[in-house]
């Protein structure tokens, strides 16, 4: 055994030595760790090599070496297996049969007896099972326990299955709109309520249309359907707008309340523009301006006002023209330039009028004010803004006296001007 192991490991004849040579023979060698015989039982040996077509070539030289299946196989790199005949091996994991996952089971055949077969689940929804139990009871209402009993009597699968399916039955009865709960009367014996099918969903349940929950159909109120039929759909870019009877009645009541006309004229331009397809907008509309409430005759009278006004005719007519005509002889000199130092020249009918003293401020005062502003800006931060002890305030009496004197002088000058008018 030791000699064969050393020969496989590549030991030369000079290196082989017996117990006399000083080398000890191992007590027990595990052949399973060094033997390569398990490769002969590998499943790749069972695979057939691809056959070449007649007249074909072998560019890679697969068939030149006897015993080789493919260059990538585990046996191709093992020189100990070269030239050995291929023997059929045992099936391994690649040849094991695979079972289908539990969720992808084949559909049950049509000839399955669900009353006796406990392994096949019936292909019906819980809502359909409830409906079938109610139809088989021949009564207008049925209890929950009666539904359980009918399902277990007719389907053997539910007799052996986990009892959690009863929770699904209760949930369908409570959440599905196809079933209606009927309370038990006082004189009826027993506990709990009854259940029955809504008549409008009975046919659909029996035909299998309610295997999955669906939303109930949408019902349109007859009043809205009639209103939609009366109001024709008009494009926003073409065709005149139409008003239904309710909107016309609201318009009439609005005109009577305001006491003004012009909104009901359907032939005019304003009538077409003010008509709205929805009565809500008409009810909430604000009061229109006064120009929109005028009739066509009044609007025709206002048309000349849109042109140019004859100002000369307006000034010449009436008392206004007489008062303004007296001012034609009044001659006013052009305004003084900033550099001029002269007085204002007022001449009425060749007679000179002196200018009031308040009209011509001296130039020196302006220059003094500039100096005062600069001085005030420079010294403003040194003084407290609310200094009550400062004596720079002037008494109000001289100011009022000076103002009265100036006002009296102005009135006297204007009285002299009015005498010439």
Curated annotation (Swiss-Prot):
Pfam families: Forkhead. Pulmonary epithelium, testis and oviduct. This is Forkhead box protein J1. Transcription factor specifically required for the formation of motile cilia. Acts by activating transcription of genes that mediate assembly of motile cilia, such as CFAP157. Binds the DNA consensus sequences 5'-HWDTGTTTGTTTA-3' or 5'-KTTTGTTGTTKTW-3' (where H is not G, W is A or T, D is not C, and K is G or T). Activates the transcription of a variety of ciliary proteins in the developing brain and lung. The keyword Nucleus applies. The gene is Foxj1. Residues 1-32, 79-110, 256-277 are annotated as: Disordered. Keywords: Activator, Cilium biogenesis/degradation, DNA-binding, Nucleus, Transcription, Transcription regulation. Belongs to the FOXJ1 family. GO terms for biological process: actin cytoskeleton organization; axoneme assembly; brain development; cell maturation; cellular response to insulin-like growth factor stimulus; central tolerance induction; ciliary basal body organization; cilium assembly. PROSITE patterns: FORK_HEAD_1 (PS00657), FORK_HEAD_2 (PS00658), FORK_HEAD_3 (PS50039). Residues 120-210 bind DNA. Residues 11-21, 259-268 have a biased composition (Gly residues). Residues 90-99 have a biased composition (Polar residues). One of its GO terms (molecular function) is transcription cis-regulatory region binding. GO terms for cellular component: nucleus. It comes from the Eukaryota. It is found in: Nucleus.
